[in-house]
């Protein structure tokens, strides 16, 4: 989604966060096809800019052993608890729901992650440049 949700917000209806709480994120995050490598060396899910599954330098190990979700709590919430879990996690870091609402689950996720990046360094929320150049 990236900047599109910020630039096109006035053209589409928005909804409260709870509308997207049960929208599944596991399939796009964990699928074995349509992934990307960014120019910073991150292995990324195909549709999820700003999320790193790990480094391309450790790709063989990553593909053999998988992602250590204990070291990547944001991914853990997205995989096992969808948006509701990530929203609750972000609230623990002071997140407040956006009054104007969200265009989609991806818009909500990006807003949650942007808030989390401002509060703490999360290995999976990379590259930092993704978040600093959103608006």
Regions found by a protein language model. Give the residues of each.
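Accessory C-terminal segments flanking Radical SAM cores
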Residues: 2-125
